[in-house]
Design a protein with these regions (language model features):
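Rossmann-like adenosine-cofactor binding region
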Residues: 53-59, 175-265
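Glycine-rich Rossmann-fold phosphate-binding loop(s) that bind the pyrophosphate
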Residues: 150
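Conserved acidic E/D residue at the C-terminus of a beta-strand in Rossmann-like folds
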Residues: 172
Length: 274
Protein backbone atom coordinates (compact mmCIF):
# COMPACT_ATOMS: atom_id res chain seq x y z
CA UNK A 1 0.00 0.00 0.00
CA UNK A 2 1.27 3.48 -0.88
CA UNK A 3 2.08 5.79 2.02
CA UNK A 4 1.54 9.55 2.31
CA UNK A 5 3.46 11.44 4.97
CA UNK A 6 1.62 14.54 6.23
CA UNK A 7 4.32 16.77 7.69
CA UNK A 8 2.35 19.15 9.91
CA UNK A 9 -1.44 18.67 10.27
CA UNK A 10 -3.63 20.06 7.49
CA UNK A 11 -7.23 21.30 7.43
CA UNK A 12 -9.82 18.80 8.67
CA UNK A 13 -11.47 18.67 5.23
CA UNK A 14 -8.18 17.53 3.75
CA UNK A 15 -7.86 14.87 6.42
CA UNK A 16 -11.41 13.69 5.74
CA UNK A 17 -10.53 13.30 2.07
CA UNK A 18 -7.53 11.17 2.96
CA UNK A 19 -9.58 9.00 5.31
CA UNK A 20 -12.19 8.38 2.61
CA UNK A 21 -9.62 6.81 0.27
CA UNK A 22 -8.51 3.28 1.13
CA UNK A 23 -5.93 3.02 -1.66
CA UNK A 24 -3.15 4.34 0.55
CA UNK A 25 -2.15 4.80 4.17
CA UNK A 26 -1.04 8.05 5.75
CA UNK A 27 0.85 9.26 8.78
CA UNK A 28 0.73 12.72 10.35
CA UNK A 29 3.99 14.13 11.72
CA UNK A 30 3.75 16.84 14.38
CA UNK A 31 7.36 16.85 15.55
CA UNK A 32 8.86 19.01 12.80
CA UNK A 33 12.53 18.62 13.60
CA UNK A 34 14.44 17.64 10.48
CA UNK A 35 15.87 14.47 12.02
CA UNK A 36 12.41 13.26 12.97
CA UNK A 37 10.97 13.97 9.52
CA UNK A 38 13.95 12.19 7.98
CA UNK A 39 13.17 9.05 10.00
CA UNK A 40 9.48 9.15 9.20
CA UNK A 41 9.74 9.54 5.43
CA UNK A 42 11.95 6.48 4.80
CA UNK A 43 9.05 4.51 3.29
CA UNK A 44 6.89 7.42 2.07
CA UNK A 45 5.69 7.52 -1.54
CA UNK A 46 4.39 11.08 -1.19
CA UNK A 47 4.95 13.95 1.23
CA UNK A 48 2.57 16.79 2.08
CA UNK A 49 4.66 19.67 3.38
CA UNK A 50 3.70 22.96 4.98
CA UNK A 51 6.38 25.22 6.48
CA UNK A 52 8.87 22.60 7.67
CA UNK A 53 12.19 21.94 5.94
CA UNK A 54 12.95 19.04 3.62
CA UNK A 55 16.71 19.14 2.97
CA UNK A 56 18.74 16.95 0.63
CA UNK A 57 19.49 14.15 3.09
CA UNK A 58 15.82 13.85 4.07
CA UNK A 59 14.86 13.51 0.39
CA UNK A 60 17.64 11.05 -0.43
CA UNK A 61 16.63 9.00 2.59
CA UNK A 62 13.13 8.46 1.13
CA UNK A 63 13.79 5.72 -1.42
CA UNK A 64 10.13 5.42 -2.55
CA UNK A 65 9.40 9.15 -2.78
CA UNK A 66 7.70 10.25 -6.00
CA UNK A 67 6.04 13.59 -5.20
CA UNK A 68 6.23 16.41 -2.65
CA UNK A 69 3.15 18.60 -2.41
CA UNK A 70 3.83 21.96 -0.79
CA UNK A 71 0.88 23.29 1.23
CA UNK A 72 1.51 26.87 0.10
CA UNK A 73 3.12 28.88 -2.69
CA UNK A 74 6.89 29.01 -2.10
CA UNK A 75 9.17 25.98 -2.18
CA UNK A 76 12.48 27.28 -0.82
CA UNK A 77 12.11 24.83 2.10
CA UNK A 78 12.59 21.92 -0.35
CA UNK A 79 15.95 20.91 -1.82
CA UNK A 80 15.02 21.08 -5.51
CA UNK A 81 18.36 19.75 -6.75
CA UNK A 82 17.76 16.49 -4.91
CA UNK A 83 14.26 16.31 -6.37
CA UNK A 84 15.63 16.80 -9.90
CA UNK A 85 18.23 14.06 -9.43
CA UNK A 86 15.54 11.63 -8.28
CA UNK A 87 12.84 12.80 -10.73
CA UNK A 88 10.59 13.67 -7.80
CA UNK A 89 7.70 15.95 -8.72
CA UNK A 90 7.12 19.10 -6.64
CA UNK A 91 3.64 20.63 -6.54
CA UNK A 92 2.28 23.79 -4.88
CA UNK A 93 -1.18 24.98 -3.83
CA UNK A 94 -1.02 28.33 -5.57
CA UNK A 95 -4.47 29.74 -4.79
CA UNK A 96 -5.26 28.03 -1.50
CA UNK A 97 -4.19 30.61 1.09
CA UNK A 98 -3.99 33.97 -0.70
CA UNK A 99 -6.97 35.46 1.15
CA UNK A 100 -5.86 34.04 4.50
CA UNK A 101 -2.41 35.62 4.15
CA UNK A 102 -3.88 38.95 2.99
CA UNK A 103 -6.17 39.01 6.04
CA UNK A 104 -3.24 38.09 8.28
CA UNK A 105 -1.23 41.02 6.89
CA UNK A 106 -4.11 43.39 7.55
CA UNK A 107 -4.50 41.97 11.06
CA UNK A 108 -0.82 42.70 11.80
CA UNK A 109 -1.07 46.18 10.27
CA UNK A 110 -4.08 47.07 12.42
CA UNK A 111 -2.63 45.47 15.56
CA UNK A 112 0.59 47.45 15.27
CA UNK A 113 -1.00 50.76 14.28
CA UNK A 114 -3.39 50.56 17.25
CA UNK A 115 -0.77 49.19 19.69
CA UNK A 116 -3.10 46.29 20.33
CA UNK A 117 -0.68 44.27 22.49
CA UNK A 118 0.12 47.21 24.78
CA UNK A 119 -3.50 48.21 25.33
CA UNK A 120 -4.63 44.61 25.73
CA UNK A 121 -1.96 43.97 28.36
CA UNK A 122 -2.89 47.19 30.18
CA UNK A 123 -6.57 46.21 30.41
CA UNK A 124 -5.87 42.60 31.42
CA UNK A 125 -3.48 43.84 34.11
CA UNK A 126 -6.20 46.13 35.49
CA UNK A 127 -4.14 49.23 34.72
CA UNK A 128 -7.00 51.19 33.21
CA UNK A 129 -5.50 54.59 34.02
CA UNK A 130 -2.28 53.75 32.19
CA UNK A 131 -3.76 54.13 28.71
CA UNK A 132 -2.97 57.84 28.49
CA UNK A 133 0.69 57.10 29.19
CA UNK A 134 1.03 54.55 26.40
CA UNK A 135 2.65 55.47 23.06
CA UNK A 136 0.41 57.04 20.44
CA UNK A 137 -1.59 55.03 17.92
CA UNK A 138 -2.02 55.90 14.26
CA UNK A 139 -4.75 55.63 11.63
CA UNK A 140 -4.26 53.71 8.40
CA UNK A 141 -6.93 55.78 6.60
CA UNK A 142 -5.49 57.83 3.73
CA UNK A 143 -2.02 56.41 4.38
CA UNK A 144 0.39 55.20 1.71
CA UNK A 145 1.05 51.47 1.58
CA UNK A 146 3.55 49.77 -0.70
CA UNK A 147 2.77 46.19 -1.71
CA UNK A 148 6.04 44.62 -2.87
CA UNK A 149 5.07 41.66 -5.04
CA UNK A 150 1.77 41.58 -6.90
CA UNK A 151 0.93 37.91 -7.19
CA UNK A 152 -2.18 36.27 -5.79
CA UNK A 153 -1.56 37.50 -2.24
CA UNK A 154 -0.73 41.03 -3.36
CA UNK A 155 -3.92 41.16 -5.43
CA UNK A 156 -5.97 39.92 -2.48
CA UNK A 157 -4.34 42.48 -0.20
CA UNK A 158 -4.94 45.51 -2.43
CA UNK A 159 -8.72 44.97 -2.27
CA UNK A 160 -8.64 45.00 1.51
CA UNK A 161 -6.35 48.03 1.74
CA UNK A 162 -8.64 49.99 -0.59
CA UNK A 163 -11.51 49.05 1.71
CA UNK A 164 -9.72 51.02 4.42
CA UNK A 165 -9.25 53.90 1.96
CA UNK A 166 -5.48 53.55 1.82
CA UNK A 167 -3.39 54.83 -1.08
CA UNK A 168 -1.87 51.70 -2.61
CA UNK A 169 1.44 51.60 -4.46
CA UNK A 170 2.79 48.42 -6.02
CA UNK A 171 6.32 47.30 -6.75
CA UNK A 172 6.58 44.33 -9.11
CA UNK A 173 8.89 44.35 -12.15
CA UNK A 174 6.85 41.57 -13.76
CA UNK A 175 3.42 43.24 -13.64
CA UNK A 176 2.53 46.13 -15.95
CA UNK A 177 1.14 49.44 -14.71
CA UNK A 178 -2.17 48.91 -16.54
CA UNK A 179 -2.94 45.76 -14.55
CA UNK A 180 -2.08 47.50 -11.29
CA UNK A 181 -4.06 50.62 -12.19
CA UNK A 182 -7.16 48.55 -13.00
CA UNK A 183 -7.08 47.19 -9.46
CA UNK A 184 -6.76 50.65 -7.91
CA UNK A 185 -3.02 50.85 -7.34
CA UNK A 186 -0.11 52.84 -8.73
CA UNK A 187 3.01 51.11 -10.02
CA UNK A 188 6.42 52.18 -8.75
CA UNK A 189 9.62 51.25 -10.57
CA UNK A 190 12.20 51.63 -7.81
CA UNK A 191 11.62 49.97 -4.42
CA UNK A 192 14.32 51.94 -2.61
CA UNK A 193 13.13 55.28 -3.96
CA UNK A 194 9.45 54.63 -3.26
CA UNK A 195 9.82 53.22 0.21
CA UNK A 196 10.80 56.54 1.82
CA UNK A 197 7.33 57.98 1.15
CA UNK A 198 5.39 55.03 2.55
CA UNK A 199 3.48 54.71 5.81
CA UNK A 200 3.36 50.92 5.46
CA UNK A 201 5.23 48.29 3.45
CA UNK A 202 4.03 44.72 2.93
CA UNK A 203 6.45 42.19 1.44
CA UNK A 204 5.22 39.45 -0.90
CA UNK A 205 8.32 38.69 -2.94
CA UNK A 206 10.27 35.42 -3.20
CA UNK A 207 13.58 34.90 -1.43
CA UNK A 208 16.34 34.95 -4.06
CA UNK A 209 19.96 36.06 -4.24
CA UNK A 210 18.65 39.44 -5.41
CA UNK A 211 16.05 39.87 -2.63
CA UNK A 212 18.04 38.49 0.30
CA UNK A 213 18.44 41.25 2.92
CA UNK A 214 16.90 43.74 0.50
CA UNK A 215 15.42 45.47 3.55
CA UNK A 216 18.51 46.53 5.49
CA UNK A 217 19.59 49.27 7.87
CA UNK A 218 20.50 51.63 5.06
CA UNK A 219 16.98 51.37 3.64
CA UNK A 220 15.26 51.38 7.03
CA UNK A 221 16.96 54.71 7.83
CA UNK A 222 15.19 56.31 4.87
CA UNK A 223 11.70 55.30 5.99
CA UNK A 224 9.19 57.51 7.76
CA UNK A 225 9.12 57.42 11.55
CA UNK A 226 5.51 56.23 11.41
CA UNK A 227 6.19 53.46 8.86
CA UNK A 228 5.08 49.89 9.59
CA UNK A 229 6.77 47.04 7.75
CA UNK A 230 5.13 43.63 7.35
CA UNK A 231 6.87 40.46 6.20
CA UNK A 232 4.57 37.51 5.51
CA UNK A 233 6.71 36.29 2.61
CA UNK A 234 10.06 34.70 3.47
CA UNK A 235 12.60 35.10 6.23
CA UNK A 236 15.85 36.52 4.90
CA UNK A 237 14.23 39.27 2.83
CA UNK A 238 14.66 41.53 5.86
CA UNK A 239 18.01 41.66 7.62
CA UNK A 240 16.77 40.80 11.11
CA UNK A 241 19.68 42.38 12.99
CA UNK A 242 19.22 45.60 11.04
CA UNK A 243 15.48 45.57 11.75
CA UNK A 244 16.11 45.04 15.47
CA UNK A 245 18.50 47.99 15.45
CA UNK A 246 16.02 50.19 13.58
CA UNK A 247 13.23 49.37 16.03
CA UNK A 248 15.45 50.03 19.04
CA UNK A 249 16.47 53.36 17.53
CA UNK A 250 12.80 54.21 16.83
CA UNK A 251 13.52 54.69 13.14
CA UNK A 252 10.14 53.14 12.22
CA UNK A 253 6.81 52.71 14.00
CA UNK A 254 6.77 48.91 14.12
CA UNK A 255 7.11 45.60 12.31
CA UNK A 256 4.92 42.55 11.81
CA UNK A 257 7.08 39.48 11.20
CA UNK A 258 5.45 36.18 10.28
CA UNK A 259 8.61 34.48 8.99
CA UNK A 260 12.21 34.19 10.14
CA UNK A 261 15.48 33.43 8.39
CA UNK A 262 16.14 30.53 10.77
CA UNK A 263 13.19 28.85 12.45
CA UNK A 264 14.22 27.07 15.67
CA UNK A 265 11.04 24.99 15.47
CA UNK A 266 12.73 22.68 12.96
CA UNK A 267 16.10 22.36 14.68
CA UNK A 268 15.46 22.61 18.44
CA UNK A 269 14.23 19.80 20.68
CA UNK A 270 10.48 19.78 21.19
CA UNK A 271 9.24 21.31 24.50
CA UNK A 272 8.43 17.87 25.93
CA UNK A 273 12.02 16.74 25.30
CA UNK A 274 13.63 19.67 27.09
Amino acid sequence: MKKILIVQPIHEKGMELLKSNSDYSYEVVEDLRVENVKQKNVDADAVSLRTSILPADAIENAKNLKIISRHGVGYDNIDLNSCKKRNIDVAITATANAVAVAEHVLFMLLSISKRKSMYDHSVKSGKFTERNKLPKTIEIWDKNILIAGFGRIGKALIKRCLGFEMNVFVYDPFVDSKTISKMGGKKVEDLSAAIKDMDAVSLHIPLTDQTKNIINYKLLKTMKKNCIIINAARGGIINEKDLDRALNENLIFGAGIDVFEVCLLYTSPSPRDS
